[in-house]
Amino acid sequence: MQNNLNLHRTLLGIAAVIIILAGVKLAAEIVVPFLLSLFIAIICSPIIKAMTQRRVPHWLAITLLFVLISLVFFFLVGLINSTAREFTQSIPQYKVLLSQRVSDLTGLLQRFNLPFTLSRETIQENFDPSIIMNFVSRVLLNFSGVVSNVFVLVLVVIFMLAEAPTMKHKFAMVISSTPHDVAKEERHIDRVLQGVIGYLGIKSITSLLTGVGVFILLEACRVQYAILWATLSFLLNYIPNIGSIIAAIPIIVQALLLNGFGIGFGVAIGVIAINMVVGNIIEPKMMGQRLGLSTLVVFLSLLFWGWLLGTVGMLLSVPLTMALKIALESSPNTAKYACLLGDVEDFK
């Protein structure tokens, strides 16, 4: 009888999770801007706290942040919409340029008596760089579509920041089973917030370093759309493991096609070097053991949240999974499931 009851509860829990995920998937147009606003508010909360500690009135700190966030969003939307439109119009020429570059390479190799033949027809049939460029355009326009309603998005962030001092206590009261558990739940919420703030803060710094490095490199090499590629590198660097690779491929392809092999290979080496230094030296040193997620879980979370919430889900995959792991750790009944998400180092 007890086994049947446990099985019934398990099946009921699985069904509830499936229904919730289906609801989130259907309501993605509402959920995605809300999540984006929530994480922006979480990132900005230490700034508000630092300003109020320096005796800046709370209302003035929020007003200044409102102006700053609005300017950043207007810049991003304006940049992506204007540059991406021009970039999209230039995509058809990439196939022709590829044929020219391969012809140049064939002539160079034949000059040194190296056998290499590849006809224009073969190139036209099997290689299409516009596929990569169209993907980049879709990603940019997708993100732009999410943040295009700047005013509403910023207002939600500001209201969240205004409610932040009391929101933690309210939420703790909702999830507490008894009044005596409120303080304990507040500590659990603090753990979630500190983990997410720490990760997003460090990731923002390293993403900014990557974006600035890419911009300086492309400007020095006179590669077209340098500001667009720098912005793309900044945004996609939030995607763990593969984000920097996704950002690097179209940059290298465009540099090879528009600027020639010399500059193209130079850009490839430069972009790889920037990502190696930031991703393998600076970020691990700053991050330390803060992440607490296994590599497999990071990759699977990227696929799952990307499927559920699109591009923004990929950007927020790690903080969402970190929040889930910490939330599972906070309850004795679910702590064992948190072990599945943790790094092997946590259990040594």
Swiss-Prot record:
Subcellular localization is given as: Cell membrane
Q: Which domain of life is it from?
A: Bacteria
Q: Name one Pfam family in it.
A: AI-2E_transport
State the membrane topology.
Multi-pass membrane protein
Q: Report TM segments.
A: 7-27, 28-48, 60-80, 139-159, 196-216, 223-243, 245-265, 267-287, 296-316
Cite the entry's keywords alphabetically: Cell membrane, Membrane, Transmembrane, Transmembrane helix, Transport
Q: Which GO terms describe its cellular component?
A: plasma membrane
A single GO BP: transmembrane transport
Chief location category: membrane
InterPro entries per the record?
AI-2E-like (IPR002549)
Q: Family assignment?
A: Belongs to the autoinducer-2 exporter (AI-2E) (TC 2.A.86) family.
Q: What is this protein called?
A: Putative transport protein HI_0338
Q: Which organism is it from?
A: Haemophilus influenzae (strain ATCC 51907 / DSM 11121 / KW20 / Rd)
